[in-house]
Amino acid sequence: MKSFIKIHKQDNVLLALRDIQKGERLHAYGVSIEVKDDIKRGHKIALQSIKENDSIVKYGFPIGHASQDISIGEHIHVHNTKTNLSDIQLYSYTPRFDENPYSNENRTFKGFRRENGDAGVRNELWIVPTVGCVNGIAEKMLQRFVRETGDIAPFDNVLVLKHQYGCSQLGDDHENTKQILLNAIRHPNAGGVLVLGLGCENNELARMKEALQDVNLKRVKFLESQSVTDEMEAGVALLKEIHEAAKGDKREDIPLSELKIGLKCGGSDGFSGITANPLLGRFSDYLIAQGGSTVLTEVPEMFGAETILMQRAANEEVFHKIVDLINDFKQYFIKHDQPVYENPSPGNKAGGISTLEDKSLGCTQKAGISPVTDVLKYGEVLKTKGLTLLSAPGNDLIASSALAAAGCQIVLFTTGRGTPFGTFVPTVKVATNTELYEAKPHWIDFNAGLLAEDDVHEEYVLREFIHYMIEVASGQLVNHEKNDFKELAIFKSGVTL
């Protein structure tokens, strides 16, 4: 493995690719550097002397400024680096577009064609509770259905989309819960859904039913638990009816243009911005060249890199949507008396990320170079092809669930620290470093750490990843599916009664 890398020609820091000891001498870009401190892999080394208040540059952009004089060879991290971020900013539209290097290869995956024309990558039977009070009933109901049915084919799996909400909520929180659940019920990865209510909740089953008048009632059933004597018997009977209606479901060839892929990172480290996130960026550009769609979220992790995305707005209308996306989320922080730059997390810092700009510039690598074609509010579903931005926080569970609810059939999740989590659609874990991939083979699905190895070409790893993604879209299970780790989390910002 190489010892270090200079990511961009304008950078004044090196990134350590292995642990480097104090006193080691590095020969880097025409300069001989004696390392002044012990440097952990993923952390930064000063490539030149940096005066107090001067910019620290990584990825070709400032990630903050020096809080003290820094000598060549010194460790650059939170002890001598400060963010440049402020609160609300003014922006101007200065478009800049790069040519997508990929072309349409007319490839396909094996998926499920739905009656409304949508395409799913899984064929699952879901119970969607209108309120958290019936989570337990739903679990028992599904277990009994599986026990009595035996062979659940053609369903790949059965799942309860458990959540804690649906009652005691007001305003936006109530509407968000309702909309996320409605989106889940319509999701193309579900071949059938039982919508299970209690009977006294704010999120009334009758209102949900009104909003779903266009669904196939052989595939989507409704049950209010308080309105029947034996809710278990009634629920299992409805699940069996859905199962019977799905008997003819089978996979067929579907163009890659119909894939909608969410882009997410969590537990990021210093390698995220040079291995896994750029890999997702290249895959995003490749998929968009096939006519497909990708979605980037985690708005707080765009802070400090937002102008790059604004330059890529397809038109001025989209630019203003991005400005509103960023400033509205900053206002959310300000409203709650929180600094907009209170990020990265302790795990991020341990992995070498020093400021939010450092994290954000690495985070946005997942979006490649394609133009931004649309911006969605939380709870909205995809409307356009290409790269879309979605309003949601950085929290792994909430952001991944928001991507799935927006219509993404798969979520790609890069991580340098590791996580077992998955949302209610296939959540592919991509390791930023080989050490994590080898330590957690039951969590991690793909190793982007290869990109830090000597003589490993970007195009080779991309082609391996494309092949793997087509296999996943065609039914190959990822680790969180094998482990049955599937979660739904809904964003809450207001009062609970």
UniProtKB/Swiss-Prot annotation:
Catalyzes the dehydration of D-altronate. One of its GO terms (biological process) is D-galacturonate catabolic process. Transmembrane segments: none annotated. GO terms for molecular function: altronate dehydratase activity. It is an enzyme of class 4 (lyase). Belongs to the UxaA family. It catalyses: D-altronate = 2-dehydro-3-deoxy-D-gluconate + H2O. Last gene in the exu locus which is required for galacturonate utilization. Its cofactor is Fe(2+); Mn(2+). Pathway: Carbohydrate metabolism; pentose and glucuronate interconversion. It comes from Bacillus subtilis (strain 168). Keywords: Iron, Lyase, Manganese. Induction: Induced by galacturonate, repressed by glucose. Its EC number is 4.2.1.7. Pfam families: GD_AH_C, GD_AH_second, SAF. This is Altronate dehydratase.
